[in-house]
Amino acid sequence: MKASSKAIKLVLDHLKSTGRVLGSVESGNSATISEKTASVNKQQQLQEKKPSVLQYRSYNPYLVKEDFLSILPENLYKKRGQFTNELDFQLMKVRDPKYFQFKDQYYLFFNDYNSLTEYIKLTKHSRINKIRVKMTPLAQPLPTLLTKLQRYSKNLYNAFRSSEQYFEGLNEKVDVSGEFTTNQLRSILDSVEEIENKSVLVWNIPTKLRSHDILNYFWFYNIRSSFKIYWDDEMKRNLRFISFENSHDAYRFKRNYHGLLAKELLTLSEKGDAADYSLEMDDSKILIEHLSE
């Protein structure tokens, strides 16, 4: 009994002094822990390198998030407005960061690679507007992609404020540094959506109409800013950015003037300037894109 008690005491003393069970090998144990830690780190690095963004190419500029939700099995028998988003992805319509033109593609941002692959699997044989869905994981590094998103967001914000702020900000450096979280991405997309709801792009407004003419002519719309972001004087073509104080006016503006002949747009004053304008007008149509559509 005494021998047994003595043996137990020796084991406890050894455990207390070394922190290891008697007979264990320290180097081997440390090596095992190091290997496990290295394995976990490697898995994390591989996960970070895997894509979390899907690219969908389409010439249709009017697709919305509900179109991509509708093809999930969980929503097949639900009405619009009742769709769920268990994979929790965010949709972005890809636009040129300088001129804001739609670039025939959409990005679906997922929280991780597993959610991305699950979406591909669930929608493999689906169709959007009778067109077979084919999505491609985006190989572009996420920081590079997010830098482009930041550039578009910043230029759009500046254009919404004023023409001066837009042109001054075109050459400003944009960089995504540090950890970029899902919440930050949501915040950027939400702010972009809010501005897009209140903004339109207009092709072919008569070149003689200056910004203050636009404000006077369309006095019954609550216009915030209006300026040309692209122009070709020789071809008498221009692209104008117009922002409104509310989304309703932006929607009404497109509905009322999209497709109108440029020469029909002007209601000239009684001062007799028709001859001056007639040389500048042609049969081109006013083309308007509401950025939220």
UniProtKB/Swiss-Prot annotation:
Top-rank taxon: Eukaryota
Note: Present with 799 molecules/cell in log phase SD medium.
Cell compartments where the protein resides: Mitochondrion inner membrane
Membrane-topology descriptor: Peripheral membrane protein
Protein known as: Protein PET54
InterPro entries reported in the protein's UniProt record: RBD_domain_sf, RRM_dom_euk
Principal location class: mitochondrion
Job of this protein: Activator of specific mitochondrial mRNAs. PET54 is involved in the excision of intron aI5-beta from pre-mRNA for cytochrome c oxidase I (COX1) and plays a role in promoting the translation of COX3.
Any one of the GO CC terms: mitochondrion
GO MF: mRNA 5'-UTR binding; pre-mRNA intronic binding; translation regulator activity
The keyword Oxidoreductase is annotated on this UniProt entry: no
Lineage start: Eukaryota, Fungi, Dikarya, Ascomycota, Saccharomycotina
